[in-house]
């Protein structure tokens, strides 16, 4: 038996015809989606209580979820902007190495709404499809078990799901998901084209007018989604009524050409296709390249426009030179294409086929199409029909199951819109319905129940001017099996349902379905009268609580309303959302029904659960006559909803001028503010309704009223200006009426500063003419000039300079306007400022010059302009870095080239010792490394710690880059200050492939460090058996001894690596070798309890322990127990650098007690500082803010995405880039690699913890360990008594040294606990210990050196965009690779801290200390921490 949710699942909704199609660009969208998913994960981790699944009143909660993440993401864009293509790529990635390859694994379920297939718009099918996919996904174990409840299964039955979709969605999807254990990573539910099938006017209120749609279901329940599930929807930006339903969603626009990265997408799409398609490239010459530049401009961000034109070029249907003649809109393109496709009267011949396709409620097969068209022309043969399909071949595509559909739904809409398609190409869907109705008539006796419903639908929509009874006779006389047509699903269309009932469809009176059919079929008075006469209750309610009267009022059936009122229907029964018949009729604008209900005494001031009255609903929807009727009846004009918004506020927002005047004339309070302090004037100014603003001012509106953010009407008008919508005239009017032009909001921002930031040059002019202060600074020290420069608004910059703006202003971080403009990237702004005399060598607080900014951001033209003006290419910042190093680090090839040409020192090192070659290599910028080698860069240059680049690449396991260095002459034996080579560190970490490469380049396998430790000993210590075998095979000395006399066998026996011991013994290791202190492998194995190793050693002839228990012989030296805080240094956390590619090499973290300053190592080496440095080019700490609930968002952005060009054209113009494709294909091009590192190591000084260690030979008990104030341990207070006990113990028992090897490095003198001891000769006994500084020593160290601040959760933005190039990649990584320990944790006892940071053992192991020494940090953490605009 199949599950009920699998019986009726629409396959069309779970697939995309674009699957497998090549996808280009849009990387920035995937980055944003990954970031949103990560936010969900973070919120899920911090969530305490799941949301309560209680239905709200219908209006969605505004804002975002209480845990800080948005409810979901809404992809918006015009027709053809690539929404469905993006969703398809997200689910079925076409590129194996793309970011979306990882994102598609987080898809829990998906649904594609398609207007061409009504089944995909069915809410019941949507719910069943989700359930089936979640069960199949395997991502949530146990979900299917929660569906075994018979009550849940009954809700999923066909028909039941359609009758009560809200209940089915809650019981079958939401409640089971809320009851599941959160998955390891957040998941998403994708619904594409959620607005399809929602054909409503913009003014209607969404909560009822969209009832029964997928959009309404999601909008009413998205706040109840589990915190780990992200709802991802797409919709057209024109579908305002739908997009408003998803308040609190993060909206991502795909065709907002104000965003540079969207323009870049369009350009890259063209370039990618040129690069991939020879058939397209052969049409390209330098003369026709300009045509493609025109194409990218004409497309206005519409990828469908680009695709149709470029496909036409490939098919030789369109010539490139004809692009100049193609209209610049999608509708214009359709008209142009039809004029090309259909000559003379060809369109009339194929028009019937298009009519049928437009009328069909699902995709039709070729046979079905032929049968329908044949009913109009019975002489049509199948061959003739096929020829007509061939004429339409460029407009039709293959659907599922050998069906034919139009290539895009926007073209279907165009064919029915006479305004755009003209009379010549106008199609008639009603004619298509007639042909389909006749086709069904011919086969009426053999129709299935669903086909019978389709038959009824086509009859209803045929415009045959027949009454319903006559259409019912049509179906009956043709023998249509109507009786069982309602046995499975109930049609959504009420007229279809009524026709089927009249034609004899059977309704089971015992089934609860009856109430649903009664509600939906009662469109006509005679039907209601019949039912009431047969005993039906006049006040019966459906599952949503709506009465017959409420449904009739909602649909505007005046006759039915009169009948029900005459039969005594209750006028005040509320439905589940608190709506009465009057509020429903007012919301829909049914004036006659409203008058009828008012005349019958309905309560005109009734409020629903959201506080909406009939008056506010009508005012919002723009229903003038309804508003007049209610006002005439004496309604309270200032009733407000839950947000204190009145009818006047709603009408002002909606732009309904006549309603605003009517309300004002009836005494509406003009200055009444909502909960956010916004009046009707602010709402009208924000929306750009000048006439309404004028009416409100004429009636006494306070022009300088502030909202909760301190913004006035002028502030929001300057903020939201699109000049085409009349906002500039609103600004002018407000200034004329006395608006304060220099009014500051809570952030200290004036309208001028906001307008400058947004780039509204007309408004800037108006404000300056009105007396605005051109040099006003906000709370963060930003002037309008700074704001305009940060966003690259050249026209605004010129205007401000014309009005005398001061050019020498400096922000809170010491940056001039030129510095900020250089970071932003608009060369016109930079040249303008240079012409004004700004210092091209000005240093900000971090020592960065404008050239540093431009080089870091990769602005080639700006680098050229600055250098031409005299900028010094070798100027160092506070960290000793020149612009050349920054450009190399970020992978900006063209900038590196320019700086080299202008005498930048190729081997210049920063104070951390890293040069351009080092940072480029670690970031993986192969092309830049090649360029540096070609200019003579020193391949063996060492950093401040004496480590060569090859050493660091080996440490990071960057195999490819290390091999490239070796090919270019890197010294394979180059060592660090401790004598360790690249082979040492690779063996320590177990990087087998790296070891093989180093040996292949003749690395000495027996090379020893300063302590005479070999690579074999390092590998043995870590237990890397394969590395040990490899080294022995290549001649490693098995019994090589270090300074202490220990061999690899002794070390492996101590660490318990039995497989390594086995290999060493097999290759002749001496099992009886003893070190300087007489410790053999057998002895240390016995001490550590490694019984299997003891047996193995005995098998190979090791001397036994003669039956003696190891306890008295091998116990630790008896010393006084000391507090753990004096033995263990502060908490250390290691996270892999993003540059590391080694798998499975993450070593145990150095665990300890954060009693002193905490520190962290993000990487074994110095990871590049790209993330920290990227913040240098931002403006100030706070970005432009707006209220939490409105759409008064001000943050614009430019180029947030790291779009990887198809070729490196070094900032050529787009036309020049296109022309490059006309060159021979053998021409080599360099590609630009996006920076990937997001981590950075903490600095280490000569006093770093890795320099001094103290290893206790007694393992203290955690239970007796406590921390005292000031970071002192109990050991300090009890030193006298402890020392006495120790003396007694030592005198009564012989001293036996424990087998512990010395520290890997001994750089400095060893100090006693609590004091800074001068250097002195250590006794031999002490040299056998790893020394660790006490808590008192640690406290004395510089807090800045060790204390790591965790990156704040707030997203850092630069000029309105993310400054971290990989903010989207920070899934489970620590941001910037650093972790801070809360001060409260530092103050707790050590036992609590260790419980918070679980450790496999209670003390610091020698292996971990050794690991710390090898993977030591670098002194590069004192970089400037920037704050953005």
From Swiss-Prot:
InterPro entries from the UniProt entry: Ankyrin_rpt, Ankyrin_rpt-contain_sf, NPHP3-like_N
Domain of life of the native organism: Eukaryota
GO CC aspect terms: endosome
Modified residues (Phosphoserine): 1165, 1167, 1222, 1400
Compositional bias segments (type: Polar residues): 1120-1139, 1160-1170, 1238-1265
Gene Ontology BP terms: endocytic recycling; protein transport
Subunit structure of this chain's protein: Interacts with VPS35.
Function: Involved in the endosome-to-plasma membrane trafficking and recycling of SNX27-retromer-dependent cargo proteins, such as GLUT1.
Name by which UniProt lists this protein: Ankyrin repeat domain-containing protein 50
Record gene name: ANKRD50
């Amino acid at each position: 038996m199949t599950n009920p949710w699998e019986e009726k699942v629409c396959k069309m909704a779970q697939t995309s015809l674009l699957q497998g199609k090549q996808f280009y660009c849009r990387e920035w969208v995937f980055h944003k989606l990954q970031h949103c998913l990560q936010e969900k994960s973070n919120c899920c981790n911090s969530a305490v209580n799941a949301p309560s699944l209680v239905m709200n009143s219908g209006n969605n909660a505004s804002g975002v979820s209480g845990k800080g993440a948005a409810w979901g993401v809404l992809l918006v864009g015009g027709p053809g902007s690539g929404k469905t293509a993006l969703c398809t790529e997200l689910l079925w990635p076409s590129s194996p190495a793309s970011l979306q390859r990882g994102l598609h694994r987080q898809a829990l379920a998906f649904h594609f709404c398609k207007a061409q297939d009504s089944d995909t718009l069915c809410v019941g099918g949507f719910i069943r499809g989700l359930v089936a996919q979640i069960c199949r996904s395997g991502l949530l174990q146990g979900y299917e078990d929660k569906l075994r409840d018979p009550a849940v299964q009954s809700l999923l039955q066909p028909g039941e799901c359609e009758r009560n979709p809200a209940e089915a969605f809650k019981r079958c999807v939401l409640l089971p998901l809320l009851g599941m254990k959160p998955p390891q990573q957040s998941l998403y539910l994708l619904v594409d084209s959620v607005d399809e099938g929602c054909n409503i006017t913009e003014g209607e209120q969404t909560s009822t007018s969209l009832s029964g749609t997928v959009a309404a279901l999601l909008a009413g329940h998205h706040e109840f989604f589990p915190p780990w599930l992200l709802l991802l929807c797409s919709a057209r930006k024109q579908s305002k009524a739908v997009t408003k339903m998803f308040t609190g969603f993060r909206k991502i626009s795909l065709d907002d050409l104000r965003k540079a990265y969207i323009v870049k997408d369009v350009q890259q799409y063209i370039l990618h296709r040129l690069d991939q398609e020879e058939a397209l490239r052969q049409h390209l010459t330098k003369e026709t390249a300009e045509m493609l530049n025109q194409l990218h401009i004409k497309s206005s961000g519409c990828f469908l426009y680009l695709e149709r034109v470029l496909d036409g070029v490939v098919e030789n249907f369109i010539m490139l030179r004809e692009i100049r003649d193609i209209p610049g809109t999608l509708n214009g393109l359709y008209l142009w294409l039809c004029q090309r496709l259909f000559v003379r009267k060809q369109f009339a011949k194929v028009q019937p086929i298009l009519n049928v396709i437009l009328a069909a409620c699902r995709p039709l097969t070729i046979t079905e199409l032929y049968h329908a068209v044949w009913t109009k022309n019975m002489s049509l043969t199948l061959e003739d029909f096929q020829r007509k399909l061939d004429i339409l071949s460029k407009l039709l595509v293959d659907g599922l199951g050998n069906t034919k559909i139009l290539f895009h739904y926007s073209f279907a809409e165009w064919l029915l819109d006479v305004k755009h398609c003209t009379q010549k190409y106008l199609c008639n869907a009603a004619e298509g319905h007639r042909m389909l109705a006749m086709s069904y008539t011919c086969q009426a006796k053999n129709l299935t129940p669903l086909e019978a419903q389709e038959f009824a639908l086509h009859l209803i929509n045929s415009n045959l001017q027949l009454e319903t009874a006559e259409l019912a006779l049509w179906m009956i006389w043709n023998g249509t099996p109507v009786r069982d047509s309602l046995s499975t699903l109930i049609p959504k269309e009420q007229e279809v349902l009524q026709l089927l009932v009249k034609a004899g469809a059977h309704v089971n009176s015992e089934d609860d379905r009856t109430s649903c059919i009664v509600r939906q079929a009662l469109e006509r008075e005679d039907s209601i009268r019949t039912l009431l006469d047969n005993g039906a209750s006049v006040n019966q309610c459906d599952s949503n609580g709506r009465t017959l009267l409420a449904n009739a009022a909602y649909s505007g059936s005046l006759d039915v309303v009169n009948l029900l009122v005459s039969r005594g229907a209750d006028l005040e029964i509320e439905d589940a959302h608190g709506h009465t018949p009057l509020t429903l009729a007012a919301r829909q604008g049914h004036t006659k029904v409203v008058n009828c209900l008012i005349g019958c005494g309905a309560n005109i001031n009734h409020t629903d659960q959201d506080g909406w009255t009939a008056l506010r609903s009508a005012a919002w929807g723009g229903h003038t006559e309804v508003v007049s009727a209610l006002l005439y009846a004496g309604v309270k004009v200032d009733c407000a909803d839950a947000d204190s918004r009145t009818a006047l506020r709603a009408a002002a927002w909606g732009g309904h001028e006549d309603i605003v005047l009517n309300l004002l004339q009836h005494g509406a309070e003009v200055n009444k503010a909502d909960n956010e302090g916004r009046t009707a004037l602010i709402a009208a100014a924000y929306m750009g309704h000048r006439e309404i603003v004028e009416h409100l001012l004429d009636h006494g509106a306070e022009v300088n009223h502030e909202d909760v953010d301190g913004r006035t009407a002028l502030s929001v008008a300057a903020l939201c200006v699109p000049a085409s919508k009349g906002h500039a005239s609103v600004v002018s009017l407000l200034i004329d009426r006395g608006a304060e032009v220099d009014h500051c909001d809570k952030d200290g921002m004036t309208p001028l500063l906001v307008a400058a930031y947004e780039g509204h040059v007309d408004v800037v002019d108006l404000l300056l003419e009105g007396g605005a202060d051109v040099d006003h600074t906000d709370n963060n020290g930003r002037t309008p000039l700074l704001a305009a420069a940060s966003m690259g608004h050249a026209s605004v910059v010129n205007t401000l300079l014309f009005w005398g703006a001061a050019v020498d202003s400096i922000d809170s971080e010491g940056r001039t306007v030129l510095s900020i403009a250089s970071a932003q990237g608009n060369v016109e702004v930079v040249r303008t400022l240079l012409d004004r005399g700004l210092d091209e060598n000005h240093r900000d607080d971090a020592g960065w010059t404008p050239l540093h900014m431009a080089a870091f951001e990769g602005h080639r033209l700006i680098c050229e302009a600055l250098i031409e003006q005299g900028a010094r290419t070798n100027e160092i910042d506070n960290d000793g870095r020149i612009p050349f190093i920054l450009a190399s680090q970020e992978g900006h090839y063209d900038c590196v080239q320019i700086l080299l040409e202008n005498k930048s020192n190729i081997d210049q090192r920063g104070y951390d010792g890293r040069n351009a070659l080092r940072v480029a290599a670690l970031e993986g910028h192969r092309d830049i490394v090649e360029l540096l080698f070609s200019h003579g860069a020193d391949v063996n240059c060492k950093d401040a710690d004496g480590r060569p680049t090859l050493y660091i690449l080996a440490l990071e396991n960057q195999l490819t880059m290390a091999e490239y260095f070796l090919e270019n002459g890197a010294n394979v034996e180059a060592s660090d200050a401790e004598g360790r080579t690249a082979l040492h560190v690779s063996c320590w970490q177990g990087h087998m492939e790296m070891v093989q490469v180093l040996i292949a380049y003749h690395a000495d396998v027996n090379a020893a460090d300063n302590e005479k430790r070999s690579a074999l000993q390092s590998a043995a210590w870590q237990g890397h058996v394969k590395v040990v075998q490899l080294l022995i095979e290549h001649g490693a000395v098995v019994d090589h001894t270090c300074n202490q006399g220990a061999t690899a066998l002794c070390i492996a026996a101590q660490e318990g690596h039995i497989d390594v011991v086995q290999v060493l013994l097999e290759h002749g290791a001496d099992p009886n070798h003893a070190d300087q202190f007489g410790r053999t492998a057998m002895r240390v194995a016995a001490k550590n309890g490694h019984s299997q190793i003891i047996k193995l050693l005995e098998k190979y002839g090791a001397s036994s322990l003669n039956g003696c228990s190891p306890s008295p012989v091998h116990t630790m030296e008896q010393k006084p127990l000391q507090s753990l805080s004096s033995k263990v240094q502060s908490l250390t956390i290691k996270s892999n650098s993003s540059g590391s590619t080694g798998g499975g090499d993450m070593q145990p973290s150095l665990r300890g007690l954060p009693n002193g300053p905490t520190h962290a190592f993000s990487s074994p080496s110095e990871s590049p500082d790209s993330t920290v440095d990227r913040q240098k080019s931002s403006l100030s700490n706070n970005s432009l803010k707006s209220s939490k609930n409105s759409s008064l968002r001000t943050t614009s952005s430019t180029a947030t995405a790291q779009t990887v060009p198809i070729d490196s054209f070094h900032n050529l113009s787009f036309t020049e880039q296109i022309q490059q494709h006309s060159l021979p294909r053998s021409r080599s091009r360099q590609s630009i690699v996006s920076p990937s590192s997001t981590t950075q190591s903490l600095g280490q000084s000569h006093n770093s913890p890795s320099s001094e260690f103290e290893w206790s030979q007694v393992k203290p008990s955690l239970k007796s360990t406590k921390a005292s104030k000031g970071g002192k341990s109990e050991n300090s207070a009890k030193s006298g008594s402890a020392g006495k006990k120790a003396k007694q113990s030592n005198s009564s028992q012989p001293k036996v040294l424990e087998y512990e090897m010395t520290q890997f490095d001994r750089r400095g003198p060893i100090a006693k606990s609590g004091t800074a001891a001068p250097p002195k000769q250590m006794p031999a006994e002490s040299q056998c210990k790893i020394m660790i500084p006490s808590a008192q020593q640690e406290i004395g160290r510089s807090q800045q050196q060790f204390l790591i601040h965790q990156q704040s959760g707030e997203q850092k933005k630069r000029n309105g965009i993310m400054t971290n190039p990989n903010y989207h990649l920070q899934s489970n990584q620590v941001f910037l690779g650093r972790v801070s320990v809360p001060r409260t944790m530092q103050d707790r006892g050590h036992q609590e801290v260790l419980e918070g940071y679980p450790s496999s053992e209670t003390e610091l192991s020698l292996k971990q200390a050794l690991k710390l020494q090898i993977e030591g940090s670098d002194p590069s953490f004192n970089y400037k921490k920037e704050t953005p605009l």
